[in-house]
């Protein structure tokens, strides 16, 4: 499963509910992108969420 290395966001699971309160499983996927960033001074390709990219918490290589 892909997981953001900055914020830790990943796919979460839950129930989809109808008006009659019937339930079926569903999943919410985080908006993840595979980007190259500097990790320990070396370029590395990692999964990063769009929220982390927009906030400026990291710089692309």
Curated annotation (Swiss-Prot):
GO biological process, one term: translation
Alphabetical list of PANTHER family matching this protein: 50S RIBOSOMAL PROTEIN L28, LARGE RIBOSOMAL SUBUNIT PROTEIN BL28A
Gene name, Swiss-Prot/TrEMBL: rpmB
Disulfide bonds, paired cysteine numbers: none
GO cellular component annotations of the record: ribonucleoprotein complex; ribosome
Gene3D superfamilies reported in the protein's UniProt record: Ribosomal protein L28/L24 (2.30.170.40)
Superkingdom: Bacteria
Protein name: Large ribosomal subunit protein bL28
A molecular function (GO) term: structural constituent of ribosome
Species the sequence originates in: Lacticaseibacillus paracasei (strain ATCC 334 / BCRC 17002 / CCUG 31169 / CIP 107868 / KCTC 3260 / NRRL B-441)
Record family assignment: Belongs to the bacterial ribosomal protein bL28 family.
